């Protein structure tokens, strides 16, 4: 809200020319109370700062265009040095002298522009090395390569075990599973989405086939799963490459003309042991954000403790999400061991110490306990990780009860998501 209420804006950025326009949206106040700092970042890490730019003399409701040759030169240099990296330009308007309730140097307004787009990895790229070893039994297919062991259950269709250098990456008896449901937010309850989308809480999984084959120096396991409750089918493909990279493909096929509710999420979820207590990600942060609530959070490189990722809303609900994520690492701060998730397009990711069921009050927000608060929650001794292609927005188009705008919803149709899992050490 503060972002869209700000009164100073950047427009018409031409990074290669170091050119931009400042718009003073104030109705009665000239721009003399603020100065402008500019930062240039490469893959979210600051590499250049041009501070204290004088923007005096811009009248209310007026614009002024600036050209900074030094800025243009630095941007061109960084782009040439980092041809596949994302180069962004951050603009910060800061209080020049301070005033009541505002400190000198405090940020009053901000804006981010992309000078060079991110180059996403090619997920299917070939790697060198020996083909994985494979063990098959009546109940599972196990693949091993470069210290990574992946076990796909024939009865579940999921990755039931994931070990790296002999260390278990998943909580015992918990699998890497699809993620379609979220703990309803206050706005969800207002629109009764917890009832309207309820079928996605238990889609009704039934494995119809599991097969596997060698493809070059990789090995591929395919699981086909019926989802009768939502009249769809899920095809899961797990590829273990020679270097230990796991490629996960999640393909949902909807039944044409079927009348099925929209979904909250599309992606995967897993539970990691509690020692994996930190995250490092390149995406929007550091504050949680959602598809229709993310403009104020800049794309950058961030680190955080998992324990701090749940925001204590008055009552428990979905929390901790980050959008436009390029890479997401969950790791043990002591050893650096953990998992790195990447995709070929932006993801939405989170890692908190609560399961969705801990935050979900059911069909009524008073279903579990009248007046339940976030302070009543007890963190679990695990890290719940969500790796998503999509999650619907938070809505609140009116004060309460409206659905998210159409572009921030997930109607019933086909969806596909691919991402990789790599060991961090």
Regions found by a protein language model. Name each.
Residues 73, 77, 82, 118-425:
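Beta-strand/loop-rich accessory regions of lumenal/periplasmic or secreted enzymes
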Residues 1-154:
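Carbohydrate-binding surfaces of carbohydrate-active enzymes
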């Amino acid at each position: 809200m503060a972002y869209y209420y700000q009164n100073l804006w950047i427009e018409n950025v031409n990074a290669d020319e170091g050119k931009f326009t400042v718009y003073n949206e104030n109705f009665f106040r000239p721009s003399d109370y603020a100065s402008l700092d500019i930062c240039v970042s490469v893959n979210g890490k600051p590499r250049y700062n041009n501070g204290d730019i004088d923007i005096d003399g811009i009248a209310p409701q007026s614009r002024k265009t600036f050209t900074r040759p030094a800025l243009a030169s630095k941007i061109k240099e960084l782009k040439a040095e980092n041809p596949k990296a994302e180069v962004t330009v951050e603009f910060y308007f800061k209080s020049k002298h301070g005033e009541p309730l505002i400190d000198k140097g405090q940020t009053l307004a901000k804006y981010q522009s992309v000078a060079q787009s991110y180059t996403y990895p090619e997920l299917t790229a070939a790697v060198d090395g020996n083909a994985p070893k494979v063990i098959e039994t009546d109940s599972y297919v196990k693949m091993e390569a470069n210290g990574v062991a992946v076990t796909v259950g024939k009865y579940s269709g999921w990755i039931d075990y994931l070990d790296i250098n002999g260390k278990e990456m998943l909580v015992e008896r918990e699998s890497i599973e699809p993620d379609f449901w979220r703990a309803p937010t206050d706005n969800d309850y207002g629109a009764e989405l917890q009832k309207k989308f309820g079928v996605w809480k238990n889609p009704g999984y039934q494995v119809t086939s599991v097969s596997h084959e060698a493809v070059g120096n990789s090995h591929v396991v395919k699981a086909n799963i019926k989802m009768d409750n939502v009249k769809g089918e899920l095809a899961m493909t797990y590829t273990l490459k020679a270097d230990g990279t796991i490629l996960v493909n999640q393909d949902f096929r909807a039944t044409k003309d079927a009348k099925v509710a929209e979904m909250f999420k599309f992606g995967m979820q897993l539970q990691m042991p509690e020692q994996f207590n930190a995250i490092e990600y390149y995406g929007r942060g550091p504050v949680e954000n959602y598809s229709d609530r993310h403009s104020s959070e800049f794309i950058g490189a961030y680190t955080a403790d998992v324990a701090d990722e749940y925001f204590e809303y008055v009552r428990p609900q979905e929390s901790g999400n980050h959008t436009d994520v390029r890479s997401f690492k969950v790791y043990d701060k002591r050893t650096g061991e953990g998992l790195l998730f990447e995709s070929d397009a932006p993801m939405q990711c989170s890692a908190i110490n609560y399961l969705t069921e801990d935050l979900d009050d059911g069909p009524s927000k008073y279903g579990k306990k009248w007046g339940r608060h976030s302070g009543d929650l007890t963190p679990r001794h695990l890290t719940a990780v969500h790796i998503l292609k999509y999650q619907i927005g938070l809505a609140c188009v009116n004060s309460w009860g409206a659905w998210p705008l159409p572009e921030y919803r997930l109607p019933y149709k086909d969806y596909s998501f691919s991402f990789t899992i790599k060991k961090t050490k």
